[in-house]
Amino acid sequence: MKALYPGSFDPLTLGHLDLIKRGCSLFGEVVIAVLENPTKSPTFSLESRIAQIKDATKEIRGVEVCSFKGLTVEFAKRKNADLILRGLRAMSDFEYELQIAHTNRTLNQNYETVFLATEAHFSFLSSSVVKEVAAFGGEINHMVPERVATELQQKFK
Amino acid sequence: MKALYPGSFDPLTLGHLDLIKRGCSLFGEVVIAVLENPTKSPTFSLESRIAQIKDATKEIRGVEVCSFKGLTVEFAKRKNADLILRGLRAMSDFEYELQIAHTNRTLNQNYETVFLATEAHFSFLSSSVVKEVAAFGGEINHMVPERVATELQQKFK
Amino acid sequence: MKALYPGSFDPLTLGHLDLIKRGCSLFGEVVIAVLENPTKSPTFSLESRIAQIKDATKEIRGVEVCSFKGLTVEFAKRKNADLILRGLRAMSDFEYELQIAHTNRTLNQNYETVFLATEAHFSFLSSSVVKEVAAFGGEINHMVPERVATELQQKFK
Amino acid sequence: MKALYPGSFDPLTLGHLDLIKRGCSLFGEVVIAVLENPTKSPTFSLESRIAQIKDATKEIRGVEVCSFKGLTVEFAKRKNADLILRGLRAMSDFEYELQIAHTNRTLNQNYETVFLATEAHFSFLSSSVVKEVAAFGGEINHMVPERVATELQQKFK
Amino acid sequence: MKALYPGSFDPLTLGHLDLIKRGCSLFGEVVIAVLENPTKSPTFSLESRIAQIKDATKEIRGVEVCSFKGLTVEFAKRKNADLILRGLRAMSDFEYELQIAHTNRTLNQNYETVFLATEAHFSFLSSSVVKEVAAFGGEINHMVPERVATELQQKFK
Amino acid sequence: MKALYPGSFDPLTLGHLDLIKRGCSLFGEVVIAVLENPTKSPTFSLESRIAQIKDATKEIRGVEVCSFKGLTVEFAKRKNADLILRGLRAMSDFEYELQIAHTNRTLNQNYETVFLATEAHFSFLSSSVVKEVAAFGGEINHMVPERVATELQQKFK
């Protein structure tokens, strides 16, 4: 099966990476879809984020990396995905995730959002926490892939 | 009884409309008070929002539509309302709603905030979700009244 | 308006009493409906609970105290109530309350459950906490009306 | 793919049934595994529950109904399932579900628990709510399949 | 400082043990107070639980193990403790913990309940989950100290 | 013991002040560390906030007031603090607080974040609620120390 894993990945964390690995081993194929949102000003450009994800996933079979604009359900259809994959952290905005899953189902009944529980020791991790720690010069190697750590530290030097 | 239903209604959703109908049949009168908040830049002007609400509620007996600035409890007093009405969605910011209700009671003991549970199938709906879907060209007729859908689609064309 | 306030009140707490007073001043009449639930073995008999509530509310205009078996919405109809009243504590089982409110609306569209936020300093209070403290000989006068405190202390002597 | 959908189903609700249909169309095969839990005294015997589920799912392709004792991950392995399927209601015990999903992963890394968001209008529904309403003679046809409604009403007559 | 760490510890988990170690290094002394609750029928007797805790903490400086009946705040006073220590798991009953902390403060203003966040990878762990897995013959060595694992497995053989 | 109490305190509320008093009586010393966050535009300048806090705490023994930039755990180390102190309101972002506590522990194992439950009647209070009420000319004397109330009212005149 082919799963679409949408997100801003600004930047990719080890929690995202864990979910990608588990998604690939469970469904076989995961399309990592980086959302290009004109209303937001991301820390990393779309190109950098795609390069970071490609670098971090180059050893994982069944991964495709791309970007998209517009509705997730429409992009899932264009990519012939079977489902939309999302992670649920104990400390995540559970209500927001259910709200988006319900909204997507009203837009296209065929697209289920499938949730996997994020690993317990990644449950405190989010891109915003990583950026806050990096901005203050803190250690982030246990939070993000190597290349992301290097590029973040350069950005906040 | 007269209920004051305050909010930004940017824009009005079918969830709001359902609550207005139920408020009117329960209490007899509902004053829909559109908050004019100088610190925010709404998607629709105050005039458009008032026109949208008037259009959507023209068949409902006991509805008044107006705008206000300043404290909700003070406006409730000016409008001779008996209570403040708010909706609670399973997927709403329950803690924020209770925080505002407590704050309002410390400002004026006479004004109770009365909560009604939003209909289950509207529990995923919020103005921000509607705008996000509309911005990406998604179908919103099942989320907002007709006039709001048309005006939103024009805005994001 | 007439509100039906259903519960087991095993025993009545100062949080319940606060809600009864606010319900009466807001709606005019509150029917306190003590649920007789054959599947549960309450600490106080139905008669004791009704006597405790009558004693605690004797100074409050617009209060009626009675018991009922079966569905809340059906009893509300029999008592000609206009709505069902429930309290929401920050530390209450919000999801359970919404679940019951939705269930009741599917059983009888005419019966809305109206929630009031429990006073902040009562938000930690529940009948089970009161009984736990009383069982261990703790001070409970700041949690329950006087008669309830006396009868609880006798029970756990 | 083959999903294992474990639960007590005491009794099966329309929320469960909706999840079974969506699981089958998404994964192709769903094994409905009724947990036989010696420490609990269910309302319906294991046989009745299995018969009810078989009756309600007879038109759905890819469904298998059976019972099991012991650990879910071990039974999933015995049935050659690819994953464990669970529903997440906005008003469900999200934290308990994540707790069980994490526990199962520590017991067998190969078994992911995949969550689907329960349909919004079923989000208030649970077996315990159904039994409570039925016990008080309330209408339950909008909550459970026909056969379950009939057998529940006979039980509580 | 001396912290009182009350609980039923039925049985002690690695999450409890982690909190005990962190409490000792932070405050110097931790009194592990096993609650003897006549209204409950524990899996392990009071003596077994005390023996298990003593065995698991024998290498930790500053630990005392005892049992108590009645109010936590009163026992804290009898033991000359400075504060009450509790763990908060992301997946714990946060509202129940706050409810008990508030209740204890109304009973004795001098006793603060101090919370530490349970380690992320223990956040799914609780005594009831451990017993459920053990009852079904599952692996529990990653959840409880060795002696507890052995005694649990004997109990459920 | 010395506790570091970090925050933006923009402005100090009576809820903060209550926690400072309780922290001092529990640990002996509390360093109130006002975070200087270049990415945010606070309502009050750093100097005004420090002056407000010094004024409000001048009668409390064991208080030190200062500001810091960068990582909380690093500043805690520089100030020789023994722990980080935070308040938990029933209506606070519990998940965000746990996320920060876990993050800080991964950055420096030696720094525990210790939580105290905010007093029940302050549980609805936050700096943002205070500013919203003050902006609309509402009464705030029951929410903030006197000097803060005066300065806020001047700011929003």
From Swiss-Prot, chains A, B, C, D, E, F:
Its EC number is 2.7.7.3. GO terms for cellular component: cytoplasm. Transmembrane segments: none annotated. It catalyses: (R)-4'-phosphopantetheine + ATP + H(+) = 3'-dephospho-CoA + diphosphate. The keyword Nucleotide-binding applies. Substrate binds at residues 8, 40, 72, 86. ATP binds at residues 8-9, 16, 87-89, 97, 122-128. It comes from the Bacteria. It is found in: Cytoplasm. Pathway: Cofactor biosynthesis; coenzyme A biosynthesis; CoA from (R)-pantothenate: step 4/5. The record marks 16 as: Transition state stabilizer. Keywords: ATP-binding, Coenzyme A biosynthesis, Cytoplasm, Magnesium, Nucleotide-binding, Nucleotidyltransferase, Transferase. GO terms for molecular function: ATP binding; pantetheine-phosphate adenylyltransferase activity. Its cofactor is Mg(2+). The keyword Cytoplasm applies. One of its GO terms (biological process) is coenzyme A biosynthetic process. Belongs to the bacterial CoaD family. Homohexamer. PANTHER family: PHOSPHOPANTETHEINE ADENYLYLTRANSFERASE. Reversibly transfers an adenylyl group from ATP to 4'-phosphopantetheine, yielding dephospho-CoA (dPCoA) and pyrophosphate. NCBIfam families: coaD_prev_kdtB (TIGR01510), cyt_tran_rel (TIGR00125). This is Phosphopantetheine adenylyltransferase.
